[in-house]
Swiss-Prot record:
Residues 37-69 are extracellular. One of its GO terms (cellular component) is host cell membrane. Belongs to the asfivirus X69R family. Glycans are attached at N51. It is a single-pass membrane protein. Residues 1-15 are cytoplasmic. This is Uncharacterized membrane protein X69R. Coiled coil: none annotated. Keywords: Glycoprotein, Host membrane, Membrane, Transmembrane, Transmembrane helix. It is found in: Host membrane. The chain crosses the membrane at residues 16-36.
């Protein structure tokens, strides 16, 4: 479901934003890929995915604890 929302928003943005702003289009393509990969994971792998992503973006060791019941 989240993937479809991101794809719809990306399509709307691609129609509204001129082609000169290719970075915005690239951002949404990357977001679609990230959401697609995220939805293929199970609940425990999702927390590891965000730990890795956030630590890569911030440059610091980020730990999100999983409270899966």
């Amino acid at each position: 479901m989240l993937l479809y929302i991101v794809i719809i928003v990306a399509c709307i943005i691609s129609k509204l934003v001129p082609n000169e702003y290719w970075a915005i289009h690239l951002f949404f393509i990357i977001m679609i890929f990230m959401v697609y990969m995220y939805e293929k994971l199970d609940i425990h792998q999702k927390y590891q995915f965000w730990n890795y992503t956030m630590s890569g973006l911030s440059g610091h060791n980020v730990q999100i604890t999983c409270k899966c019941y």
